[in-house]
Amino acid sequence: MAPWSGLWGGKLAAGESPVLRSRFYAFIRAFVVLSVLLLIVELGAYINGWDDLAASALALPVIGVESLYASWLRFRATYVAPFIQFLTDACVVLFLIQSADRLIQCLGCFYIHLKRIKPNPKSPALPDAEDPDAAYYPMVLVQIPMCNEKEVYQQSIAAVCNLDWPRSNFLVQVLDDSDDPTTQTLIREEVLKWQQNGARIVYRHRVLRDGYKAGNLKSAMSCSYVKDYEFVAIFDADFQPNPDFLKRTVPHFKDNDELGLVQARWSFVNKDENLLTRLQNINLCFHFEVEQQVNGIFLNFFGFNGTAGVWRIKALDDSGGWMERTTVEDMDIAVRAHLRGWKFIFLNDVECQCELPESYEAYRKQQHRWHSGPMQLFRLCLPDIIKCKIVFWKKANLIFLFFLLRKLILPFYSFTLFCIILPMTMFVPEAELPDWVVCYIPALMSLLNILPSPKSFPFIIPYLLFENTMSVTKFNAMISGLFQLGNAYEWVVTKKSGRSSEGDLISLAPKELKHQKTESAPNLDAIAKEQSAPRKDVKKKHNRIYKKELALSLLLLTAAARSLLSKQGIHFYFLLFQGISFLLVGLDLIGEQIE
């Protein structure tokens, strides 16, 4: 799924259902109050030496306040502990299944590297694009959907216009859904400048901006001239393909009529900007290096990432085209194309630069959409998957692995096991959660996640803690999408910084000069003028307060104090550091602050 950064039509989405948010927070708050009360009781028992009653409370009669505590111990052991132990065992089973899935994927990736397996086009490398008749240069439509992306539109348009492909054989569509008149004017002027420099590029703006990104792409595909093109490459507004992108992706389609999609991996211009971007980089490196590559090699199927990919237009049409029914139109079209028998290729060695969200607020909203959308899609696609005439193992892979295990079970057990059940077992010690579940296997899984980005090894502990912290957002999103709560169907702006715009345009200038024989790269003067102009109305950055994260921080720190009384070392340290992680996130002390 792509980190889509636009907002189409309607009001700005808060990213989650207000009803679900309030109920979820009320549940966490009640749990915190209960845990504090239990901690007070346990502290009193510890001070008075009643902790020895735990072994004899079921047999020996006691009197006074001590008898009340003994009654609580009997009730806890008889009624509470079995229920919590059942929940614990169920979550541990899910945890082991998911860990086994992750391990198998890592072994598949290791096998790919060991055997040096990679997709190779059946045709040889393409010669210089100046001679389009010398080789395979099919007609390619290049689309840049965007919406109010003032910070990044110049670099994406410049990068796409400098693609090394015969000018007569590709057309750029700038699909601008901006509702800001100033942004519309800037983008329209940028397109005009490239047109004047010889680029085949058109500007499209919709009056009725329905359907979000899917509606934008669907509208663009309805143009009469699209019938003249065989393939369509899609780049979100913050993506900057290298000049040889089409030369390294399109040849895979030649003599391979079953191939519907070629997907490239992402690289990030701001991965070292702050701790938040470093942790995101770990996650996404694993996603591309392991998940996408393994599924592409062994299954010829994976979720389309929404950008930096080339589709065969026939495959899009055969699969029903772009649909606006969910907020994950990229995954939607990929699943439908897979059900129609189309194959996918993932190119791990072809990279396309983009940006990572630098603030926690932007990242949280992005993750909410990424985890609510698949649940919407699962509800809609399940009947089609069951009725589809594909082989059984492909149906099983889609239902049990692609959707249930990786999109539903993972966020469910992560939140439930480490944020709910683990604290509960501290106050109900008769229900046990083994050390290897709390520490050893999560550490191993984090180590596997970090292998595709070995330079990130020093961040392994922050990564583990932050992933557990994000589980509250992912769990909330999953429930929202599964039960169609609130604004699960709304888009959320992902703020972009446009950090590399001027440098990238300058680096593209020689390429543009070489092909078009012009005097200067478009809009460099405008950039310089904008930078020299005095800035007005500079907005102050501030920290947001996230109540759910702060409440969970208090819960985990309370449980840590209780585990200290029980002398449970590993549990204490895990709860302590996890509680601190929730505290830092709740105070918005990770990543850039928002304006």
UniProtKB/Swiss-Prot annotation:
GO molecular function terms attached to this record: glycosyltransferase activity
EC number: 2.4.1.-
InterPro entries found in the cross-reference section: Glyco_trans_2-like (IPR001173), Nucleotide-diphossugar_trans (IPR029044)
Annotated GO biological process: cell wall organization
Record field: transmembrane: 30-50, 77-97, 408-428, 433-453, 545-564, 570-590
Major site of localization recorded for this protein: Golgi
Domain of life, per lineage: Eukaryota
Residues binding substrate: 236, 238
Protein name, per record: Probable xyloglucan glycosyltransferase 9
Organism encoding this protein: Oryza sativa subsp. japonica (Rice)
Name of the encoding gene: CSLC9
